[in-house]
């Protein structure tokens, strides 16, 4: 008898512990369990898929109770009556909104309560009416939406077929007239100023060839650096005086900026005069005995009075020590019968040929 006593005590302790654990779990599941509770009747006007006795009741997202009872309405089997038991401190009102929510990945249903301002009359049992479609899950909502779409498509199958046929006819017409459409679009781009920009046309200044026999050659080395000029002359565009709109020259470009072009053609002219004693560029190797410094004063088309091209240069010959040996102005003009790029370039060629011939003769005498 004495041997069995410890086993009885141990068994009693184990049973008590098991009961305590179950009681604790029940208390947790019922939000404290022993607190005062209030029951409310809830009526759902449709199915409540998955809702079970013991399911949670949430007020503004906070668990306040559970579903105590479920059943069908005796007067209308489509309705579902439920009894919820919530903590008495929960501010349930006569206009509190009731719904059904599905939580988690598995979609566990819970009863949801939200808001409410109207206080129910004392003594009257409070019945809450759930919102229409409160028990509708996302799957059911999607199924109903697809069913409605299918119904709409079925009712309008004829017009839809006609619309698709019209699209096909329109598409075939576009395919047959692709070339014409490209032309129309190109015309619209031109009309609206769009499309690719116009291609610029480059013009060169011709080097004079017939400079006569070299009666006198350069007796010392000569360099011709890039001429100086004001900013307006540092351009490849055709210049006009006075400045105006000349649409015929919108796409006109000299082969290089005016100072570099004048330098290159002057050196070419000296080479054509006497290749054996041709001048150097300042970037060439070695230091020349003299430099021919050019400042461009005019290189333009003048439209005041008789239309003409004008070239004006100031020239100075400087020795190694920076001393000016000789200087002079060289200016000329050429009548321009027609203000267009080809005629203008021909006039510049003629004027530059006179400038180059005069500079060469003056330079070989001064050096």
From Swiss-Prot:
<keyword id="KW-0472">Membrane</keyword>
<keyword id="KW-1133">Transmembrane helix</keyword>
<dbReference type="InterPro" id="IPR003399">
    <property type="entry name" value="Mce/MlaD"/>
</dbReference>
<feature type="transmembrane region" description="Helical">
    <location>
        <begin position="8"/>
        <end position="28"/>
    </location>
</feature>
<dbReference type="Pfam" id="PF03886">
    <property type="entry name" value="ABC_trans_aux"/>
</dbReference>
<dbReference type="InterPro" id="IPR005586">
    <property type="entry name" value="ABC_trans_aux"/>
</dbReference>
<keyword id="KW-0812">Transmembrane</keyword>
<dbReference type="GO" id="GO:0016020">
    <property type="term" value="C:membrane"/>
</dbReference>
<dbReference type="Pfam" id="PF02470">
    <property type="entry name" value="MlaD"/>
</dbReference>
<protein>
    <recommendedName>
        <fullName>Uncharacterized protein bll6063</fullName>
    </recommendedName>
</protein>
């Amino acid at each position: 008898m004495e041997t069995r006593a410890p086993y009885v005590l141990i068994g009693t302790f184990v049973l008590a512990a098991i009961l305590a654990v179950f009681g604790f779990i029940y208390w947790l599941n019922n939000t404290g369990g022993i607190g005062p509770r209030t029951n409310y009747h809830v009526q759902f006007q449709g199915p409540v898929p998955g809702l079970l006795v013991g399911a949670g009741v949430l007020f503004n997202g906070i668990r306040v109770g559970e579903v105590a009872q479920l059943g069908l309405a005796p007067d209308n089997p489509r309705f579902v009556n439920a009894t919820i038991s919530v903590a008495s401190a929960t501010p349930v009102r006569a206009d509190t909104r009731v719904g059904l929510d599905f939580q988690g990945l598995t979609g566990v249903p819970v009863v949801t309560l939200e808001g409410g301002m109207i206080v129910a009359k004392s003594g009257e049992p409070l019945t809450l009416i759930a919102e229409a479609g409160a028990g509708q899950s996302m799957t059911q909502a999607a199924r109903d939406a697809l069913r409605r779409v299918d119904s709409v498509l079925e009712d309008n199958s004829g017009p839809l077929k006609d619309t698709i046929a019209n699209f096909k006819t329109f598409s075939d017409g576009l395919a047959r007239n692709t070339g014409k459409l490209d032309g129309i679009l190109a015309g619209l781009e031109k009309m609206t100023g769009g499309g690719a920009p116009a291609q610029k046309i480059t013009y060169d200044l011709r080097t004079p060839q017939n400079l006569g026999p070299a009666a006198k050659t350069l007796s010392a080395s000569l360099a011709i650096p890039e001429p100086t000029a004001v900013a307006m002359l540092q351009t490849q565009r055709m210049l006009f005086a006075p400045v105006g709109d000349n649409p015929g020259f919108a796409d006109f470009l000299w082969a290089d900026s005016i100072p570099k072009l004048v330098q290159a053609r002057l050196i070419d002219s000296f080479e054509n005069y006497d290749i054996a004693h041709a001048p150097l560029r300042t970037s060439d190797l070695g230091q020349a005995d003299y430099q021919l410094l050019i400042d461009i004063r005019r290189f333009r088309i003048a439209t005041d009075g008789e239309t003409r091209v004008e070239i004006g240069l100031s020239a100075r010959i400087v020795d190694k020590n920076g001393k000016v040996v000789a200087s002079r102005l060289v200016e000329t003009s050429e009548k321009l019968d027609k203000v267009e790029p080809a005629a203008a370039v021909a006039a510049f060629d003629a004027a530059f040929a006179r400038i180059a011939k005069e500079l060469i003769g003056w330079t070989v005498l001064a050096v």
